[in-house]
């Protein structure tokens, strides 16, 4: 008897690919055959996928890149990808197709609809991406990593959470050491490529803190390569113990040891912080077209687990005030930690697996 076959469509950014990777690993353990459908850009992120996953590069494109001629070619490239994917699906008849967003998912999701294969989406952010919004009403379920998520009327939204790495799950609910008269860890990061505004504002905010607090802080801050030296110099002027680098290794350990986290509110970052259970100050990316990072932070902020600080309000003075407020109120900080755990979904991968298995029916869904 042949193995059940899952096609995962994802690409564009690590935000789409990492949860797709988590699902692929879980389905392989369940004995499924797994195929990843992505484009050349998404293929840069496949290094973490198991060698047992078949990688298929499809023809796709985005209207957000390139000049006028490149944009004119986009529909033709996508159409070619859809034709190829449709022909393959007619031959293979996959049991389930799951899209994780991004333009590279268009060929597989369109082909799944045309051939009537069971299909669903996973949306990482609190606002549907462009491609997921197109397909949301034409799939069985929209699995939502962030809750609530803004979905079109008629779409079946289900809260599954965002899958997190096994190393994060292992640190889930690690005992929180509240701030006090002992060394305190402050973790600062800005996503996959850092955030210049955090490099500008955080060191200046730390300089405004009372010396008694500064003397207790141990700071690890991610920064862009071009910002590392100046950020380090700013802390050196304060004679502080800091680690500034373009990439912070062993994030699960760093999260579990932190008294406070300051970061962007990307979907995966929020999920990781909630699962470990740490107080956070979120600075959403202001240029995000759909303001999805503000939506991502809504759950923990409403629960009392985090403080939302839009870029328009982020100054050394406002940030210093917020940091001091959290680090001088240990009981309140502990409650923030507990609140983060209350909105965490450590079993997000298992929830996705359950949906896939439910969809794996012998008859195709209606189109």
Swiss-Prot record:
Broad class of enzyme this protein falls into: transferase
Example GO BP: peptidoglycan biosynthetic process
Residues binding UDP-N-acetyl-alpha-D-glucosamine, per UniProt: 13-15, 125, 165, 192, 293
Instruction: Tell me the Gene3D superfamilies matching this sequence.
Output: Glycogen Phosphorylase B
- Cite the Pfam families for this sequence: Glyco_tran_28_C, Glyco_transf_28
The coiled-coil segments of this chain are none
EC number(s) recorded for this UniProt protein = 2.4.1.227
UniProt cross-references to InterPro entries, sorted A to Z: GlcNAc_MurG, Glyco_trans_28_C, GlycoTrans_28_N
**Its membrane topology:** Peripheral membrane protein
Which one of the record's GO molecular function terms can you name? UDP-N-acetyl-D-glucosamine:N-acetylmuramoyl-L-alanyl-D-glutamyl-meso-2,6-diaminopimelyl-D-alanyl-D-alanine-diphosphoundecaprenol 4-beta-N-acetylglucosaminlytransferase activity
Purpose: Cell wall formation. Catalyzes the transfer of a GlcNAc subunit on undecaprenyl-pyrophosphoryl-MurNAc-pentapeptide (lipid intermediate I) to form undecaprenyl-pyrophosphoryl-MurNAc-(pentapeptide)GlcNAc (lipid intermediate II).
Gene Ontology cellular-component terms for this entry are:
plasma membrane
Q: Which family does it belong to?
A: Belongs to the glycosyltransferase 28 family. MurG subfamily.
* Catalysed reactions, as listed in the record: di-trans,octa-cis-undecaprenyl diphospho-N-acetyl-alpha-D-muramoyl-L-alanyl-D-glutamyl-meso-2,6-diaminopimeloyl-D-alanyl-D-alanine + UDP-N-acetyl-alpha-D-glucosamine = di-trans,octa-cis-undecaprenyl diphospho-[N-acetyl-alpha-D-glucosaminyl-(1->4)]-N-acetyl-alpha-D-muramoyl-L-alanyl-D-glutamyl-meso-2,6-diaminopimeloyl-D-alanyl-D-alanine + UDP + H(+)
Give the protein name, as stated in the record: UDP-N-acetylglucosamine--N-acetylmuramyl-(pentapeptide) pyrophosphoryl-undecaprenol N-acetylglucosamine transferase
Native species of this protein? Jannaschia sp. (strain CCS1)
Location in the cell reads: Cell inner membrane
- Pathway the protein contributes to: Cell wall biogenesis; peptidoglycan biosynthesis
Q: Which UniProt keywords apply?
A: Cell cycle, Cell division, Cell inner membrane, Cell membrane, Cell shape, Cell wall biogenesis/degradation, Glycosyltransferase, Membrane, Peptidoglycan synthesis, Transferase
């Amino acid at each position: 008897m042949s193995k059940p076959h899952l096609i995962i469509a994802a690409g564009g950014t690590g935000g789409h690919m990492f949860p797709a990777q988590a699902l692929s690993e879980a389905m392989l353990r369940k004995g499924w055959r797994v195929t990843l459908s992505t484009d050349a850009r998404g293929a840069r992120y496949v290094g973490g996928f198991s060698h047992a996953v078949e990688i298929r590069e499809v023809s796709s494109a985005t209207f957000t890149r390139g000049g006028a001629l490149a944009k004119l070619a986009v529909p033709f490239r996508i159409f070619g990808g859809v034709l190829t994917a449709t022909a393959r699906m007619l031959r293979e008849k996959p049991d389930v197709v799951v899209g994780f967003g991004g333009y590279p998912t268009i060929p597989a999701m369109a082909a799944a609809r045309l051939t009537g294969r069971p299909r669903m989406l996973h949306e990482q952010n609190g606002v549907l991406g462009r491609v997921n919004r197109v397909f949301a009403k034409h799939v069985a379920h929209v699995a939502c990593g962030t809750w609530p998520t803004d979905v079109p009327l008629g779409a079946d939204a289900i809260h599954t959470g965002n899958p997190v790495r096994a190393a994060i799950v292992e640190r889930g609910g690690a005992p929180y050491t509240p701030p006090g008269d002992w060394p305190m860890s402050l973790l600062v990061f800005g996503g996959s490529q850092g955030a210049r505004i955090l490099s500008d504002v955080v060191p200046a905010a730390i300089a405004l803190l009372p010396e008694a607090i500064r003397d207790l802080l141990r700071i690890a801050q991610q920064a862009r390569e071009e910002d590392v030296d100046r950020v380090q110099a700013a802390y050196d002027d304060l004679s502080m113990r800091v680690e500034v680098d373009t990439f912070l290794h062993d994030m699960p350990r760093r999260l579990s040891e932190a008294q406070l986290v300051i970061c962007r509110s990307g979907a995966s970052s929020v999920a990781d912080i909630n699962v470990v259970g740490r107080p956070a100050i979120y600075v959403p990316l202001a240029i995000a077209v759909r303001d999805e990072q503000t939506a991502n932070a809504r759950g923990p902020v409403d629960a009392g687990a985090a403080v939302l600080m839009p870029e328009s309000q982020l100054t050394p003075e406002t940030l210093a005030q917020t940091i001091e407020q959290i680090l001088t109120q240990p009981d309140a900080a502990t409650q923030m930690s507990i609140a983060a755990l209350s909105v965490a979904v450590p079993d997000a991968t298992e929830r996705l697996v359950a949906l896939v298995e439910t969809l794996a029916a012998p008859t195709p869904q209606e189109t």
